[in-house]
């Protein structure tokens, strides 16, 4: 491959779609001399990305896993309230509901859910959340309708190593994140599509850099890079494929590839749809090879936890905003990636103000 080249990038970091803002931490009295973190909600609207008459509200909850009672105890007072021990913060995505009601009431309904959880295992350690009780307004959410959700423990629990394999575990919602998006805009690329490779293909990757607002004394900085302006994280996402030869069998030049990429008119944003996520919007025409990577309206959602669980969990508790985006053209197989140079194209727009909010209490 040719050596890398860089093309100027336009972005406006002031727009709400480039940022996810933090929940302020508010403590409230419990009445028994103790304090607890006040439940809160946040609403982000991405309905300006696509003209649509039907919007959905995606619901992501953040809360804490408690162990209820002491399984080793053999005696005790019958009227005693069982002891609740805080084990870890966690995230549970409920799914979506039509945007037809009061969003604040929707958030309040999430706080009344009764959810238990337990560990399981397949090829990965799993956390199985069981919905015991949920208000009627949430019944159309996928997780509530199914009564359970089995998720990768590393991606959805802050400290899965603290969760025991036995005992009664309860998940208590404390923060509710509501994202309003056009119904057809949320498209998660099938894993099979992401694994396609071939010597006659180029891989298109998105190198996303995210600024993270974090105190220099925080242990989180050990997982972040540092610049003069603060701390940041890097993500690498597979966003498409392009052929190395044209219809006449001739090798496609990088100039032609760059022209095709620019014609996609890509924009990138941060949101909380399936947990902290990078959203990609292609407003231009897409080739047959690129079509499976986007919805019919040209959007794609990349949960950050799939690329880097560690970065995703940092974004549970810290404000973040897009810093830069580059499109990297790589060879179509991992073997050739190892022995060829990459090619950079930085013509992607950063949606203004796409910010991720911090949830400060989520610490190990």
From Swiss-Prot:
It is found in: Virion. A motif (FPIV motif) lies at residues 23-26. One of its GO terms (biological process) is viral budding via host ESCRT complex. One of its GO terms (cellular component) is viral envelope. GO terms for molecular function: structural constituent of virion. InterPro entries: Matrix_C, Matrix_N, Matrix_Paramyxo_C, Matrix_Paramyxo_N. It comes from the Viruses. Late-budding domains (L domains) are short sequence motifs essential for viral particle budding. They recruit proteins of the host ESCRT machinery (Endosomal Sorting Complex Required for Transport) or ESCRT-associated proteins. The matrix protein contains one L domain: a FPIV motif. This is Matrix protein.
């Amino acid at each position: 491959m040719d050596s890398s080249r860089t093309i100027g990038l336009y972005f406006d970091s002031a727009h709400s779609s480039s940022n996810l803002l933090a929940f302020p931490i508010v403590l409230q009295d419990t009445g028994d001399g103790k304090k607890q973190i006040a439940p809160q909600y946040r609403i982000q609207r991405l309905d300006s990305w696509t003209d649509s008459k039907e919007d959905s509200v995606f619901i992501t909850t953040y809360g804490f896993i408690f162990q209820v009672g002491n399984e080793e105890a053999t005696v005790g007072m019958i009227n005693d309230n069982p002891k609740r021990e805080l084990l870890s913060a966690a995230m549970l995505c409920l799914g979506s509901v039509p945007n037809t009601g009061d969003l604040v009431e929707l958030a309040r309904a999430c706080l009344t859910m009764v959810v238990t959880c337990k560990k399981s295992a397949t090829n990965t350690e799993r956390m199985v959340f069981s919905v015991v009780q949920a208000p009627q307004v949430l019944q159309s959410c996928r997780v509530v309708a199914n009564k359970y959700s089995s998720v990768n423990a590393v991606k959805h629990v802050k400290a899965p190593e603290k969760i025991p394999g036995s005992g009664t575990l309860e998940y208590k919602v404390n923060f509710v994140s509501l994202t309003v998006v056009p119904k057809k805009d949320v498209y998660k690329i099938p894993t099979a599509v992401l694994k396609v490779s071939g010597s006659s293909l180029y891989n298109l990757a998105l190198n996303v850099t995210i600024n993270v607002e974090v105190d220099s004394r925080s242990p989180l900085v050990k997982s972040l890079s540092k610049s003069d302006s603060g701390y940041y994280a890097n993500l690498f996402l597979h966003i498409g494929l392009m052929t190395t030869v044209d219809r006449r069998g001739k090798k496609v030049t990088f100039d032609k590839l760059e022209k095709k990429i620019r014609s996609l008119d890509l924009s990138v944003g941060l949101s909380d749809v399936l947990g902290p996520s990078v959203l990609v919007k292609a407003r231009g025409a897409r080739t047959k090879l690129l079509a499976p990577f986007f919805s019919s309206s040209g959007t794609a959602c990349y949960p950050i936890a799939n690329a880097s669980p560690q970065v995703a969990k940092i974004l549970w508790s810290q404000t973040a905003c897009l810093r830069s985006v580059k499109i990297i053209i790589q060879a179509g197989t991992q073997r050739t990636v190892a022995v060829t140079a990459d090619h950079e194209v930085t013509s992607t727009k950063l949606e203004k103000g796409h910010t991720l909010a911090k949830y400060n209490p989520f610490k190990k």
